[in-house]
Amino acid sequence: MKPSEIREMSIEEIDAKIRELRLQLAKERGLLTMGTSLENPMVIRNLRRDIARLLTIKKEKLREREKGKVKK
């Protein structure tokens, strides 16, 4: 997921995407724990990075919102 795509999303959409990716990450980790070999081991790393990217941009948006409230 590209940062430009995330920046176009609203905070609510970002929250929904974070929940979705965390659920998917839990499933992948569960498969790994059970001893199942993953089709693509990079999936877990990519999910973690996407979640971090979403959280970072969400925090940026919240700071911008707070900054706007303070100036008014």
From Swiss-Prot:
Question: Which PROSITE patterns does the UniProt record give?
Answer: RIBOSOMAL_L29 (PS00579)
Which Gene Ontology terms describe the biological processes this protein takes part in?
Answer: translation
Q: Has keyword Signal? A: no
Q: Which Gene3D superfamilies match?
A: 1.10.287.310
Keyword annotations for this protein, in alphabetical order, are: Ribonucleoprotein, Ribosomal protein
Signal peptide start-end: none
Q: Which domain of life is it from?
A: Archaea
Which Pfam families does this chain map to?
A: Ribosomal_L29
Kindly state one GO CC term assigned in the UniProt record. Answer: ribonucleoprotein complex
List, alphabetically, the HAMAP family matched. Answer: Ribosomal_uL29
Family to which this protein belongs: Belongs to the universal ribosomal protein uL29 family.
* Subunit structure of this chain's protein: Part of the 50S ribosomal subunit.
Q: What name does UniProt use for this protein?
A: Large ribosomal subunit protein uL29
Q: Which organism is it from?
A: Pyrococcus furiosus (strain ATCC 43587 / DSM 3638 / JCM 8422 / Vc1)
